[in-house]
Amino acid sequence: KTSSEDDVLNDDTDADDSASLAVTAIQPSGGSSSNVSSGSSYNSSGTSVTGTYGTLVIGADGSYTYTADQSAADDLDAGDTATDVFTYTLSDGTATDTATLTITVTGINDAPDAIDDTDSVNEDATVTKTGSQNDVLNDDTDADDSASLTVTQIKKDGGSNSAVSSSSTYNSNFTSVTGTYGTL
């Protein structure tokens, strides 16, 4: 957050002088504490610490920015949440106190990872692949849910996409694409 209404100091107070409050240290959950440079803001000499799901950059003025690390959060299904918790030290120049900043990371529907497939057939024969161990989805994955993968389009090199019916199987109502050397 970059405005004074939304930084970590917004709801922190000091009975002596709230104007002199500053963040002096930051610590990710389970990590080491790092000093925050006096007079810094998140975008000018701010201190960067890595949490479980992303990186927080925080300044002494309480401003911060958090950047989620998609690879760390890939295991979250769409709509699932996890939290990154950071403990910051607040100082008025004489005494200190600590508080936490909790960032909620929400999973998104990650794109599946389709792996190229190859096969071979004699010129006068047919090759048929069925079942989970032999079809084109066998080596494809989805961080969210590999069990729900389906083929939705197919095309030959240089051709256009052909939609695949959701009720298609290899022996009924299937979509065929004619290539240079045969029909798929």
Could you say what each language-model-derived stretch is?
Residues 99, 111-114:
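Long alpha-helical scaffolds
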Residues 14, 84, 92, 110, ...:
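Acidic active-site catalytic centers that drive phospho-/nucleotidyl reactions
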